[in-house]
From Swiss-Prot:
GO terms for cellular component: Cajal body; nuclear speck; nucleolus. This is Target of EGR1 protein 1. Keywords: Acetylation, Metal-binding, Nucleus, Phosphoprotein, Zinc, Zinc-finger. A zinc finger (C3H1-type) spans 294-322. It comes from Pongo abelii. The modification Phosphoserine is found at S5, S358, S428. SUPFAM superfamilies: Ribonuclease H-like. Its main location: nucleus. Inhibits cell growth rate and cell cycle. Induces CDKN1A expression as well as TGF-beta expression. Mediates the inhibitory growth effect of EGR1. Involved in the maturation of snRNAs and snRNA 3'-tail processing.
């Protein structure tokens, strides 16, 4: 899949039927490899035209970051959105972005209603100013294959805050971010508040002091809209869990079911890169779910709920995402069966002689319900409530909600899945999707895939001049809160001075 061509020709698309799963004629599943282009200082100029072309021709761009830390975790979960914003701002001013992932998705209407060409890039960065790097972040990134020696030797240099002179014509990460703004494409992130704040401070300008000014700036920077796949997975797709790897794998599986049923489904193509680029391509495997999955150990409850476990690869319980989803789906089906049985019993009681479905006789006053009927109704309502609670934003987690916000630097989103690599651990020896290296590029791809699948699952969209996927438009997930952050410019907020200067740089003095 997406193998290198030997003639050095222009990269050609390589198809992946059904998303990131492809079947042979014999029905055997193939492991599909997602090519992630590594971009560093030694090939940044060479890759510059490809980066610009991918961004400018994309229908939407997904972004992910790896950070050097975040600071005080409690402040990042402050129930006051303004105080939470200030805490993230402090982190962005004192920490840095270590790597940037870009996944550009371009529609191919001639190849199907939901066909995309996906181009994925992983940029290794090096902030040229002093910044804090946290030990936990280092441990996590090293555990997932991040090469700090390579980062310091080959990281693309950049500076934070406001521009230093005219940088609009230089080939830099800051100019690349400006080109992303100029492209006016929808921006897709996962649990995106932290990413947005860090992107602004590191590649754009000094952050404004107030959240209202920040969202006003964002509204003008990305007029096509900002989309958060964590919000989409939790509030619209209603997944049991919404951390990135869970959402991605769940969408993969559902997309495979739709493909098998002949229903509308997502298909992807990747570029067939020439052999001259071989040293700069990292192929990430996406495995089909096993038909008969062994159950060697119990599932880690912490990882199942949050996508993160404090024991990491030393955990004796399973972190297998497919096994977690299998268990969730089995539990949901069991609840549906029990609910149907209770509904049948309820109807049988209502149809007994002397009872009325409306609780009211034809020629007399209302009669009391049969005692058993009342109990059955209460049980049914309770079960429905349990189902709804399970699909709400992890109410049982309390103030711990996700830990994602507080540990995004050592991302819990897909943390510590490589359990089979630790000698002596009792985890499943079978590899799972996303195993091994933890890359901002592949995370960006997973983020974009989830958004593309959400579009498929919502069915045909009415032709209008309105925004793409209006239910998710400009809504950014806030951990621990029941409502998202709305990216909008209110009548009480003004854009920041630094932002206005950047807009003049992007669009000219007008």
């Amino acid at each position: 899949m997406a193998a290198d061509s030997d003639d050095g020709a222009v990269p050609a698309p390589a198809a992946s039927d059904g998303g990131v799963s492809k079947s042979t004629t014999s029905g055997e599943e193939l492991v599909v490899q997602v090519p992630v282009v590594d971009v560093q200082s030694n090939n940044f100029r060479e890759m510059w035209p490809s980066l610009l072309l991918a961004i400018k021709t994309a229908n939407f761009v997904a972004v992910d970051t790896e950070l050097s830390g975040l600071g005080d975790r409690k402040s990042l979960l402050n129930q006051c959105s303004e105080e939470r914003y200030k805490a993230v701002c402090h982190a962005a001013r004192t920490r840095s972005i270590l790597s940037l992932g870009l996944a550009c998705f371009k529609r191919q209407p001639d190849k199907g209603e939901h066909s995309y060409l996906a181009q994925v890039f992983n940029l290794t960065l090096l902030c040229m100013e002093e910044y804090v790097i946290e030990p936990k972040s280092v441990q996590f990134l090293i555990q997932h294959g991040f090469n700090f020696n390579q980062q310091y030797a080959q990281g693309i240099p950049y500076h934070k805050g406001n521009d230093k002179g005219d940088e609009s014509q230089s080939q830099s990460v800051r100019t690349l971010f400006l080109e992303l703004i100029r492209a006016r494409r929808p921006l897709v992130l996962h649990n995106g508040l932290i990413d947005l704040v860090f992107l602004y401070q590191n590649f754009y300008a000094h952050l404004p002091e107030s959240l209202g000014t920040f969202t006003a700036d964002l509204c003008e920077m990305f007029p096509a809209g900002i989309y958060d796949t964590k919000y989409a997975a939790e509030f619209h797709a209603r997944f049991v869990a919404s951390y990135l790897e869970y959402a991605f794998r769940k969408c993969e599986r559902e997309n495979g079911k739709q493909r098998a049923a002949g229903s509308p489904h997502l298909t992807l193509e990747f570029c067939n890169y020439p052999s001259s680029m071989r040293d700069h391509i990292d192929y990430r495997c996406c495995l089909p779910p096993a038909t008969h999955r062994p159950h060697p150990t119990s599932i880690c409850d912490n990882f199942s709920a949050y996508g993160w476990c404090p024991l990491g690869p030393q955990c004796p319980q399973s972190h297998d995402i497919d096994l977690i989803i299998d268990t969730d789906e089995a539990a949901a089906e069991d609840k549906r069966r029990r609910r149907r049985r209770r509904e049948k019993r309820k109807m049988a009681l209502l149809n007994l002689p002397g009872t009325q479905t409306s609780g009211e006789a034809k020629d007399g006053p209302p009669k009391k319900q049969v005692c058993g009927d009342s109990l059955k109704a209460e049980e049914t309502e309770q079960e429905v409530a349990e189902d709804e609670t399970r699909n709400l934003p992890h109410s049982k987690q309390g103030n711990k909600n996700d830990l994602e916000m507080g540990i995004k630097a050592a991302r819990p989103e897909i943390a510590d899945t490589a359990t089979s690599e630790v000698p002596g651990s009792q985890a499943s020896p079978n590899p799972v999707p996303g195993d091994g290296l933890h890359r901002a590029g592949f995370d960006a791809f997973m983020t974009g895939y989830v958004m593309a699948y959400v579009e498929v699952s919502q069915g045909p969209q009415p032709c209008s001049s309105g925004p793409w996927l209006p239910e998710c438009h400009n809504k950014v997930y806030l951990s621990g809160k029941a409502v998202p952050l709305t990216v909008a410019k209110s009548q009480f907020s003004r854009s920041s001075k630094a932002h206005n200067q950047k807009m003049k740089l992007a669009w000219g003095s007008s």
